């Protein structure tokens, strides 16, 4: 990065999950950081505020020609601040291009895949940090900059092929699935992006072995597969899933690597952990230390975040794709096998809702009862040709639409688990329910 630490780094869209993480990394490494965004509150700004990073409202007057402007991917060059920076001749660099440049001095590990990126990056960062100095950037708004870091672990998003800016030493690839239908044309189009990424990895790829698309990857570096099959290089055996978490033995081919206990739920989290263990194993880290660090993992933001209110368990999860909904419900059933599971889902984007309508209905029907919230449009689309009622008609386990002003139908359930899922603002429905539940007299045994 040269001698640019004394420059002022201005983040356009600092409340974005990746942008806030990167801002924290730079701040903790001693860089001078500030940013701007809309005035609406986002959960990502809490850590920025705790760290003393200034957050300003969007205004072209925030920009000075001597600063380095890091532009969030959601904002075009015509945005008032970016346009002013270009006009003044300030250095403007996109988020993913900045990261590509920033990671060069480190042993870099990119975590990518259609699902599971954030949880896997969080676990990887937690494990590595407990063993060696590590900087990391997680998609839940968490970032950490270690002054003398050996490793840099980061989440690499496939949306609009942004991850092709990176040439990491290692990559964990969790899966390939059809998502982001506003950009990708087909599953083959998604695969082509991952195939290009595979050619850019410098040392090795760790890929989920039960994914038929990942099995087709071609690369100049070794591809190590992890999973439960005898064909996998890194295998989980003797898996035990209980209400306390999951435990399993790990083998490299027929060589015993170690016994691991993961305080997380769902088959998908075991697979995510295998990817992390594989990286640590091939980097020759102490497997006993890896197991110890894994035992203390507390999870990441908005991934099966739970609380108890009255007689109810309330879960908040970012799941916004059918595969993620299935995984979240699977985790809930593992932890609470004797409780009714109530799903409250807010679809994210009209294009995704249309493209995956039947798959959403099938996934949601794994719950005991389903409630829906109106579709959350993204910054790129505010309306579409699909209604939430269209999804509701395909769901067999309910499908009633609730509003923020009336979540009272959820009061019909007692001693159950209510799982709020979505990538939009589903948390406002959760908060409305929590408030209503707290103010309701119930017979709690």
Swiss-Prot record:
<dbReference type="Pfam" id="PF02875">
    <property type="entry name" value="Mur_ligase_C"/>
</dbReference>
<dbReference type="Pfam" id="PF08245">
    <property type="entry name" value="Mur_ligase_M"/>
</dbReference>
<dbReference type="GO" id="GO:0051301">
    <property type="term" value="P:cell division"/>
</dbReference>
<dbReference type="InterPro" id="IPR005758">
    <property type="entry name" value="UDP-N-AcMur_Ala_ligase_MurC"/>
</dbReference>
<dbReference type="GO" id="GO:0008763">
    <property type="term" value="F:UDP-N-acetylmuramate-L-alanine ligase activity"/>
</dbReference>
<keyword id="KW-0963">Cytoplasm</keyword>
<feature type="binding site">
    <location>
        <begin position="113"/>
        <end position="119"/>
    </location>
    <ligand>
        <name>ATP</name>
    </ligand>
</feature>
<keyword id="KW-0131">Cell cycle</keyword>
<dbReference type="InterPro" id="IPR013221">
    <property type="entry name" value="Mur_ligase_cen"/>
</dbReference>
<dbReference type="InterPro" id="IPR036565">
    <property type="entry name" value="Mur-like_cat_sf"/>
</dbReference>
<keyword id="KW-0133">Cell shape</keyword>
<keyword id="KW-0436">Ligase</keyword>
<comment type="pathway">
    <text>Cell wall biogenesis; peptidoglycan biosynthesis.</text>
</comment>
<dbReference type="GO" id="GO:0005524">
    <property type="term" value="F:ATP binding"/>
</dbReference>
<keyword id="KW-0067">ATP-binding</keyword>
<dbReference type="GO" id="GO:0008360">
    <property type="term" value="P:regulation of cell shape"/>
</dbReference>
<comment type="function">
    <text>Cell wall formation.</text>
</comment>
<dbReference type="GO" id="GO:0071555">
    <property type="term" value="P:cell wall organization"/>
</dbReference>
<dbReference type="Pfam" id="PF01225">
    <property type="entry name" value="Mur_ligase"/>
</dbReference>
<dbReference type="InterPro" id="IPR000713">
    <property type="entry name" value="Mur_ligase_N"/>
</dbReference>
<dbReference type="GO" id="GO:0005737">
    <property type="term" value="C:cytoplasm"/>
</dbReference>
<dbReference type="GO" id="GO:0009252">
    <property type="term" value="P:peptidoglycan biosynthetic process"/>
</dbReference>
<keyword id="KW-0961">Cell wall biogenesis/degradation</keyword>
<keyword id="KW-0132">Cell division</keyword>
<dbReference type="InterPro" id="IPR004101">
    <property type="entry name" value="Mur_ligase_C"/>
</dbReference>
<comment type="similarity">
    <text>Belongs to the MurCDEF family.</text>
</comment>
<keyword id="KW-0547">Nucleotide-binding</keyword>
<dbReference type="InterPro" id="IPR036615">
    <property type="entry name" value="Mur_ligase_C_dom_sf"/>
</dbReference>
<dbReference type="InterPro" id="IPR050061">
    <property type="entry name" value="MurCDEF_pg_biosynth"/>
</dbReference>
<keyword id="KW-0573">Peptidoglycan synthesis</keyword>
<protein>
    <recommendedName>
        <fullName>UDP-N-acetylmuramate--L-alanine ligase</fullName>
        <ecNumber>6.3.2.8</ecNumber>
    </recommendedName>
</protein>
């Amino acid at each position: 990065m040269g001698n640019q630490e004394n420059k002022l780094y201005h983040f356009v869209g600092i409340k974005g999950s990746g942008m806030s993480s990167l801002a924290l990394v730079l701040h903790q490494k001693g860089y001078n950081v500030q940013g701007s965004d809309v005035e609406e509150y986002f959960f990502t700004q809490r850590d920025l505020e705790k760290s003393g990073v200034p957050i300003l409202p969007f205004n072209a007057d925030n920009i000075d020609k001597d600063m380095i402007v890091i532009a969030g991917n959601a904002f075009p060059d015509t945005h008032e601040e970016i346009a002013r920076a270009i006009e003044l001749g300030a250095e403007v660099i996109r988020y993913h291009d900045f990261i590509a440049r920033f990671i060069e001095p480190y042993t870099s590990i990119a975590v990518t895949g259609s699902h599971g990126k954030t949880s896997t990056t969080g676990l990887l960062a937690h494990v590595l940090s407990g063993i060696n100095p590590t900087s990391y950037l997680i998609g839940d708004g968490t970032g950490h900059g270690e002054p003398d870091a050996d490793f840099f672990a980061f989440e690499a998003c496939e949306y609009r092929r942004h991850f092709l800016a990176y040439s990491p030493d290692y990559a964990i690839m969790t899966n390939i699935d059809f998502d982001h239908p506003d950009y990708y044309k087909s599953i083959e189009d998604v695969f082509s992006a991952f195939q290009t990424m595979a050619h850019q990895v410098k040392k090795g790829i760790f890929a989920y072995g039960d994914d038929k698309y990942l099995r087709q990857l071609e690369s100049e570096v070794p591809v190590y597969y992890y999973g439960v099959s005898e064909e996998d290089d890194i295998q989980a055996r003797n898996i035990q899933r209980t209400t306390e978490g999951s435990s399993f033995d790990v083998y490299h081919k027929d060589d015993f690597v170690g016994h691991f206990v993961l305080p997380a739920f769902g088959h998908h989290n075991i697979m995510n952990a295998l990817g992390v263990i594989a990286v640590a194993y091939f980097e020759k880290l102490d497997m006993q230390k890896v197991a110890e660090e894994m035992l203390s993992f507390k999870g990441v933001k908005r991934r099966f975040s739970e609380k108890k209110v009255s007689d109810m368990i309330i879960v908040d999860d970012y799941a916004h794709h059918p595969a993620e909904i299935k995984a979240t419900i699977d985790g809930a059933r593992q932890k609470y096998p004797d409780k009714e599971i109530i799903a409250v889902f807010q679809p994210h984007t009209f294009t995704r809702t249309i493209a995956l309508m039947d798959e959403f209905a099938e996934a949601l029907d794994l719950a005991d009862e389903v409630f829906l919230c109106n579709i959350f449009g993204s910054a790129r689309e505010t309306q579409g040709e699909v209604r939430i009622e269209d999804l509701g008609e395909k769901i067999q386990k309910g499908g009633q639409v609730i509003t923020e002003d009336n979540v009272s139908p959820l009061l019909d359930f007692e001693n159950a688990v209510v799982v709020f899922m979505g990538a939009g603002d589903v948390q406002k429905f959760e908060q409305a329910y929590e408030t209503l539940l707290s103010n309701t007299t119930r017979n709690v045994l």
